Amino acid sequence: MKSERKIAIEKREATLKTLTQIDDNLWTMVYKSSYGLDSLLKKGSKGVMDSVKHLQNEVKTNGIVPNPEKDGFACSTFNAQNPDGDYIFGRNFDYKAAPCLVCWTAPENGYKAVSVVDTTFFIHGTKYMPLVKSKKKMRAMAAPYASMDGINEKGFSIAVLELKTKATKQNTGKTPIITTVAIRAALDKCATVDEAIELFASYDMHDLLGLNYHYQLADANGTSAIIEYVDNKMFVIRQDKDKKNLILTNYFLTPGGDNHDGRGMDRYERIETTLNEKNGVIAEYDAMDLLSKVALNYRHKLGHMVIALWSAVYNCNEKSVLLCAGMDYTKKYKFYVDKPGEIIKL
């Protein structure tokens, strides 16, 4: 009989064999290992190293070396409906130029999902860092806890966006949870927006990197909501009968939030204008075009480029994602939750 350690190592190696480079900006991977979400949620996490140590034990390696950096994300999200009646969710992830990784997961006690990972979490932000080298390749095992957005088999989708204000550090006696573990938990455990709101409310949030974050959620029923934290209290912004399209960038929508720099208001207004002109109905390719128009592309004061690492349009009814990576909008890919490892170039 194989030992638990041997089984874990075999699953880890099987996962890494699926790691595939599509081009300079995009990788894919099918995660075949256990990442132990249930036990991590039970014991809680207050920082990156809590999840890293937990994951190292699950996959039997000490080669997972996270290096998240406080350089400033600048993202955009919105929900809408396409002409066929499907509910869609658009997302730009703007950050230090680096490849992104599309990762499929299929936990034993959760929903299957496909998510997009910011590889700066484990390859230090260098755009063409060779993940194929063994020492770097092992770091891809951190993918389940480095997802920034994704969709699951029920059509529930989520994305995180940064706010430039002090981090949320709740201390109400609930089990602590960090930003990326909350995203993973929502994808694995929630079928609807309401279930995700309930999940977030059941934990004490501990933000990463000394910054605050908010989240937009969407599901196959057409429901969307925004979760924000102001002064360590959780707030939920919901749709109303006159406003089905919610939009999020990098400033608070909750009254009392610190919007000292109004970052992202221009992007918000451009998205809002376009959706209003279309009465909230927009084709997926047009949604991608809108994302391209609000994507950031500039040189940071520290010398690196800030771009849209990826632009994604999730279809909550198809359980799919239309994706462009590295601001190359001439290359469009489609990925489905139920087709792990399948790369559809459009």
What are these regions (language model features)?
Residues 241-287:
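Charge-rich, low-complexity intrinsically disordered segments
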Residues 92, 154, 161-163, 218-220, ...:
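Structured loops at beta-to-helix junctions and adjacent beta-edge loops in soluble globular domains
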Residues 100-101, 169-172, 198, 226-230, ...:
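A short secondary-structure junction signal
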